[in-house]
From Swiss-Prot:
The keyword Cell membrane applies. It catalyses: Na(+)(in) + 2 H(+)(out) = Na(+)(out) + 2 H(+)(in). It is found in: Cell inner membrane. This is Na(+)/H(+) antiporter NhaA 2. Na(+)/H(+) antiporter that extrudes sodium in exchange for external protons. GO terms for biological process: regulation of pH. It comes from Pseudomonas putida (strain ATCC 47054 / DSM 6125 / CFBP 8728 / NCIMB 11950 / KT2440). Its main location: membrane. It is a multi-pass membrane protein. It comes from the Bacteria. The keyword Membrane applies. One of its GO terms (cellular component) is plasma membrane.
C-alpha cells in the first residue's frame, strides 16, 4: 500500500513544483515585457506625439445591439474591462492557494498573512503621516500594493541560488496582498452602492452555479453569465473588476466527474483513433468523433481552475498587463507641476511609503510574530531573505497605478502619484537586486569559511 502511495505522492509533488516553476517563469518574463511597455508609454507621453497618446485612450468604443448601446473610452474598457480578466486570474490563484498551496493550512499561511498585513499597514500610515490635503489623503492605499509580475521577475534575475521557499514566501505574500487590495477597492474606492445592480449580478452568479451543477466544462458557456455579473457590479457603483475576483473564487478546484476515469478514457479513445487511422479505407470524417471525445477527456483530466489559469495566465501576463501599463504609465512630465505643494508631497509620500514602508512593515511584523513564538521561518528562509522579500514588495507598479486611478480626481495629484510609483518601483528593484547579490555573496563566503580545507 505504501509503495503505491509513495509514487503517487511523488507525482503530485512533481506536478505542483512544475506548475510553480511555469508560473514563476511566466511572471519573470512578463516583468520584462511590462517594463518595456511602461518605458514606451513614458517616452510616448513626453514626445512630440504626446497628443496622439492622450487621443488614443480617449477614443470612444461602443458595444450594444440596436438601441441598447454602451459607449465608453478605450481607457475605460482597458481599466474596467480587460483588467477584470486579470482579477479573474487573481481570484483563481487565491482559490488554488487556499485549496492546495501556501494558504491551504493556517500554519503555512500565518507568517505570509501577518507579513502582508504589515506591508499594507505601515506604508498606508507612512503616507498619511505626510499631512496631505483631504483630497490627497484618498491616496493612502496607493503604496500598499505589490506588482507580483515585477517582484517575481526581479527575484528571477538573482538566479536559482535563491531558495525555492523564498520564492514561495514572496508568492504567498503577494497573493495575500492582492486579497487585501481587492478588499480595499471594494470598501474604500467604490461609490455609493445602487442595490438594484445586485439583482443583476445575482442572476449571473446563479447562471454560473447552474452551469457548474450540470457539469458544463466549456469556458465559452460562462462568458455571458460572467458578463452579466460584471454588468451587475458596474450598476451597483462598485468597481466592476471585482466580478473577476468573485468568478475566480467560484472556479471549481476538482475535475469534473466522468463516467470513467479520464486517463482510462484517453487510453480508450486513443486506441480507437489509431485503429480508425490505420484502417485501409478510412475516411477523415471517421476520425472526428474519437478526436472530439479525446479532447473532452483531456480537458476533463485537469480541474477547471488549473485549466483556466493555464489558458488565461499567458494572455494576461503578455497581453492585458502590458496594454494596461501602456495606457496608464504614460505620465506627461510637463503636465505635473511638482513645484506645487500638493502634487510634490503626493509623489514623495508614495515613493517613501513603497521603498521604506513595505520592507519596514514586512520585516518588523515577521520578526514580532517569530519573536512571540506564533510563527517560525520556513526552511531555508532567513532574515536576509525576509528583507529581500520586503524590498521587492516595494515594487508597486501596475497595482499601485490601478489604485491611484481610483483614488485621485485631480490630474496633477494623479500624475504625481504615478511618478512616485514608477520611481519607487525602480528604486525598490535596484535595492532588491543589490541586497540579493550581497546576501548571496555573504552566504557563499560563510559556506566557504565553514567548509573543511
Amino acid at each position: 500500500m505504501h509503495k503505491q502511495e509513495l509514487p503517487r505522492a511523488q507525482k503530485l509533488a512533481e506536478r505542483a513544483f512544475a506548475n510553480l516553476e511555469r508560473f514563476l517563469h511566466i511572471e519573470a518574463v512578463s516583468g520584462i515585457v511590462l517594463l518595456i511597455a511602461a518605458v514606451a508609454a513614458l517616452i510616448w507621453a513626453n514626445s512630440p506625439a504626446a497628443d496622439s497618446y492622450e487621443a488614443l485612450w480617449h477614443t470612444p468604443l461602443t458595444f450594444g445591439v440596436g438601441s441598447h448601446v454602451y459607449s465608453q473610452s478605450l481607457h475605460f474598457w482597458i481599466n474596467d474591462g480587460l483588467m477584470t480578466i486579470f482579477f479573474l486570474v487573481v481570484g483563481m490563484e487565491i482559490r488554488r492557494e487556499i485549496h492546495e498551496g501556501a494558504l491551504s493550512s493556517l500554519r503555512q499561511a500565518t507568517l505570509p498573512m501577518a507579513a502582508a498585513v504589515g506591508g499594507v499597514a505601515v506604508p498606508a500610515l507612512l503616507y498619511l503621516s505626510f499631512g496631505h490635503a483631504p483630497a490627497d489623503q484618498q491616496g493612502w492605499a496607493v503604496p500598499t500594493a505589490t506588482d507580483i509580475a515585477f517582484a517575481v521577475g526581479v527575484l528571477a534575475l538573482l538566479g536559482k541560488s535563491i531558495p525555492s521557499n523564498v520564492r514561495v514566501f514572496l508568492l504567498a505574500l503577494a497573493i495575500i496582498d492582492d486579497i487585501i487590495a481587492v478588499l480595499i477597492i471594494a470598501f474604500f474606492y467604490s461609490g455609493g452602492l445602487d442595490y438594484t445592480g445586485f439583482g443583476v449580478a445575482v442572476i449571473g452568479l446563479l447562471m454560473v452555479i447552474g452551469l457548474q451543477k450540470i457539469g458544463v466544462g466549456s469556458a465559452y458557456a460562462y462568458v455571458i453569465p460572467g458578463a452579466i455579473v460584471w454588468l451587475g457590479i458596474l450598476l451597483t457603483g462598485a468597481h466592476p473588476t471585482l466580478a473577476g475576483v468573485v468568478l475566480g473564487l467560484m472556479t471549481p478546484v476538482t475535475a469534473m466527474p466522468m463516467r470513467e476515469r479520464p486517463l482510462d478514457a484517453i487510453t480508450r479513445f486513443t486506441g480507437e483513433l489509431l485503429g480508425r487511422a490505420k484502417a485501409p479505407e478510412q475516411d477523415a470524417s471517421d476520425l472526428m468523433d474519437p478526436l472530439k471525445r479525446l479532447r473532452l477527456a483531456q480537458r476533463e483530466l485537469l480541474p477547471p481552475v488549473v485549466r483556466m489559469q493555464g489558458t488565461l495566465h499567458p494572455w494576461v501576463a503578455f497581453g492585458i498587463m502590458p496594454v494596461f501599463a501602456l495606457a496608464n504609465a504614460g505620465v506627461s512630465l510637463s503636465g505635473v507641476d511638482l513645484s506645487a505643494e500638493g502634487p510634490q508631497w503626493v509623489m514623495i509620500a508614495v515613493a517613501v511609503a513603497l521603498v521604506a514602508g513595505k520592507p519596514l512593515g514586512i520585516v518588523s511584523v515577521s520578526w514580532l510574530m517569530v519573536r512571540l513564538g506564533w510563527c517560525v521561518l520556513p526552511a531555508e528562509v532567513n532574515w536576509r531573505s525576509i528583507m529581500l522579500v520586503g524590498l521587492l514588495a516595494g515594487i508597486g507598479f501596475t497595482m499601485s497605478i490601478f489604485i491611484a486611478n481610483l483614488a485621485f480626481v485631480d490630474p496633477g495629484s494623479l500624475g504625481a502619484a504615478k511618478l512616485g510609483v514608477l520611481s519607487a518601483s525602480l528604486i525598490a528593484a535596484v535595492l532588491g537586486l543589490t541586497w540579493g547579490v550581497w546576501s548571496m555573496r555573504s552566504a557563499a563566503s560563510a559556506t566557504k569559511a565553514g567548509s573543511p580545507t
